Amino acid sequence: MTQDISEKIEVISINDSQPEDSSPVVPHERQVVDCVIEIWKEDPSTESLGMSKLHALVKQKHPNWSISEKRVRSLLKQFGLAFNNQEQFTYAKEITSVMTPDIELPANVHIIMTSKRGKGLYAKRDIAKGDLIWSEEPLFFIPPLANVNLMKTASACTYCGKLLQRTESATVLKGLDCNVCSEVWCSIKCKHLDGNLHSLLKHNLYNPGSKKHKLIDAEAFLELQDYCLEEQWNALYAITLIYANCITDKSGVKQKQFDAMARVSQDVRYKALNSSAGTFDSLNGGALFVQEQQEHLWKIGYEKFLRVFPKKPVEYREFLFMMGTYNINNLDSNVFLTQSHLNHNCASNTSVETELNRTAGLKVIAGRDIKSGEELTTTYVNPSHTVHQRQRELRVNWGFICACAKCKDDLKQNERRKSSHNQQQNANNIRDMLKETKDAVGEEGIELEIPTEFNGERRKSVRFDEKVVAVKE
């Protein structure tokens, strides 16, 4: 009988406790930063917590970490994640632009250059909510880098990257296959838009014996294309296609228009990325390299870029400016001439809608009634994100700390919540306790007497061990 009972009894762990190394550990600075960011992502409301509470959450996640509140504060400041850090790196003042040549603007808008916001689009007359302000196709179209291998095998359009589901014979009958290489177009429009660029970028490697000095070295381009795919380096891929478009444009207008856009060097942008631990840069996927490694990568890309354009080399500084210019002006990888003039506001007055067919471009629609003389704005970030996240993304990717009305209101609300949360919580707890006591003892209340045998010592509270005895059925 006793043996039967013993077989039904076992010692188990409760509260889903997991064995953890309890020995103290001093975490690496990147571990601490990653932990804080993980906390913020799991619960965005924690971004407005004070340092003591944030430190407590870090310790709760990693009880064995030997880390002080002071070190957490110092690391967040070092990596530009302390929101009230006045030393956060910005680069908006280093962004330059000039008036755009040969631009055909919509009838109801015009460009104004200001000292504080640079170029901007302003309404020439009142615009009603829902009105189509303008639509435009890309000045520079960049196909999806991820579809490069599908383009090579005729599984995607060689110009726009759209996946193809038609049979090869049908494509041939429509005259959409290339008569030199294996690539195909998805439509007459794409074949027309590609023009001579397709053959310049991908065909002259078929004439290795030609003594004619090539404007574009196709073999070097295909090598760069594969390198960009391997490294997931969309900006290098994009500026190579942009420069190819510019040097083959006999009018020279495209180069002038690209040069007139908001310009900044990529190494300047990287300082902001590096100061934020690389975590919130949507254009770089959060990848972080130390400065020396990043410069080495840029120089490899630069050498490959130069080999593509043997007759039209650019200086290394200009290469970095091209990359920075592309990164702050592109939308869905494409570059639009008029849309690139829209400045940011977290509560923008326009809605920019990209088409499912990326070659069709975009539409800009009035998000509310816009008065004559009012600046047209768009939002560079998701307006539903917390003010802390929006401002980090804007600082890293576009170089400024937003001070729009929405940001100011959100910050004020955060401060009010922080100051009133504890007081309200305590007040609610007291009210609940008083109500429960009143319900339990009635209106007369109770009076407690001190026991005659009381010796002044408190009895220890009941304490449960982490191990309990369970009986198995």
UniProtKB/Swiss-Prot annotation:
Q: Which CDD domains match?
A: SET_SMYD (cd20071)
GO CC terms, sorted = chromosome; cytoplasm; nucleus
Under InterPro entries, the record lists: SET_dom, SET_dom_sf
Keyword terms of this UniProt record = Chromosome, Cytoplasm, Methyltransferase, Nucleus, S-adenosyl-L-methionine, Transferase
Primary localisation category: nucleus
User: What PROSITE patterns does the record point to?
Assistant: SET (PS50280)
- In this chain the SET domain maps to 107-381
Cellular compartments annotated: Nucleus; Chromosome; Cytoplasm
A Gene Ontology molecular function term for this protein is:
histone H4K20 methyltransferase activity
Q: What is its EC number?
A: 2.1.1.-
Top enzyme class: transferase
Task: Return the similarity comment.
Answer: Belongs to the class V-like SAM-binding methyltransferase superfamily. Histone-lysine methyltransferase family. SET5 subfamily.
Q: What does this protein do?
A: Histone methyltransferase that monomethylates 'Lys-5', 'Lys-8' and 'Lys-12' of histone H4 (H4K5me1, H4K8me1 and H4K12me1, respectively), thereby controlling gene expression and remodeling chromatin structures.
Protein name from the UniProt record: Histone-lysine N-methyltransferase SET5
Q: Which organism is it from?
A: Candida albicans (strain SC5314 / ATCC MYA-2876) (Yeast)
Q: Which gene encodes it?
A: SET5
